[in-house]
Design a protein with these regions (language model features):
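Conserved C-terminal helix/tail region of periplasmic/extracytoplasmic solute-binding proteins
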Residues: 259-269
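Short catalytic helix/loop segments, enriched in acidic residues and glycine
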Residues: 30-40
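Secondary-structure end/capping motifs
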Residues: 186-255
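Hydrophobic/proline-rich hinge and linker segments of small-molecule sensing/allosteric domains
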Residues: 68-91, 168-185
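Hydrophobic residues within well-ordered alpha-helices
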Residues: 43-45, 133-134, 256
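Pocket-lining segment of extracytoplasmic ligand-binding domains
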Residues: 125-215
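Bilobed "Venus flytrap"/periplasmic-binding protein-like clamshell domains
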Residues: 1-26, 80-138, 143-145, 247-250
Length: 269
């Protein structure tokens, strides 16, 4: 990103394929700032960007400064495929779990699941490298493209898909990421950004040729086979924030993050 680009023209994104349907082919008037999920909230608050898909848990921590943009998010309705607890033993037997330094929501979600099961293993924050994590701990939490790849490489070490576990317990979708803006960021610019991103999402949903192009690009950038990327977008992750997703988000913010009060939206549809 060049120094001359105003922050009002910058959109943050996670460097994972889970939001490629939103960002692939996005109008070039927007400058894109890629960063790990746990960094995006800081970029947003420091006015490095206009909006970004921040971790849901970070919205709970900064809801006094931020409002949410409607319709878009990073959502699962069962298996998410890319937020995975690995280990050589079941979760009930894990004495310690390594947590990735690049995540916020998945750590809150795992803590909530452990509490729900009456478990209290030691947790250690580490860089997101599965081999190193499992050398140090019984369990390892991984997110994003690394998790997708590791599931294929080490299938016998998969102990839990956290999206599936949330939905099994609550009956609601799990919202891992949500687009937010600062309360004082220009509303019209945020509307324009949301509209452009939503247009890309709709193209992905409705245009088979475009969908295949996005899948091919995501496969090439991540090294994940096209068939697996297609399955991921078909059955696991999606970018639509509907009322069921909002219900799940509200429950996560309240139950797992302890956020008081209601979600504040930048505008209502």
């Amino acid at each position: 990103m060049g120094d001359a680009v105003p922050w009002q023209e910058v959109i943050g994104r996670v460097p994972f394929i889970n939001c490629d349907p939103i960002f692939h082919g996005l109008d070039s008037k927007w400058d894109i700032l890629p960063a790990p999920p746990s960094w995006l909230s800081g970029h947003l608050i420091r006015q490095d960007c206009l909006t970004a898909p921040i971790p849901s848990a970070d919205y709970a921590a900064h809801n006094d400064e931020l409002v949410l943009l409607p319709d878009l998010g990073i959502v699962s309705r069962g298996n998410v495929g890319s937020v995975i607890l690995f280990g050589s033993r079941p979760i009930e037997s894990m004495r310690d779990i390594a947590l990735p330094s690049d995540s916020s929501t998945s750590k809150k979600l795992l803590g909530w699941i452990l509490e729900d099961r009456g478990l209290d293993p030691k947790t250690v924050e580490m860089g997101p490298d599965l081999t190193t994590m499992l050398e140090c701990c019984d369990g390892a939490l991984m997110i994003g493209d690394r998790a997708l790849s590791a599931v294929s490489e080490y299938p016998s070490f998969v102990q839990m898909d956290l999206g599936a576990e949330w939905t099994r317990i609550t009956g609601t979708p799990m919202v891992f990421g949500i687009f937010a803006k600062r309360k004082d960021a220009p509303l019209e610019s945020a509307r324009n950004a949301r509209d452009d991103m939503l247009r890309q999402c709709e193209m992905f949903e409705q245009d088979e040729r475009w969908r295949n192009e996005v899948i091919k690009s995501s496969s090439e950038s991540s090294g994940i086979p096209k068939s697996r990327v297609s399955q991921y977008f078909d059955n696991e992750v999606e970018n639509r924030l509907d009322q069921d997703s909002i219900d799940g988000l509200e429950m996560f913010l309240r139950e797992a993050c302890g956020m008081p009060g209601e979600i504040e939206w930048a505008w209502m549809n």
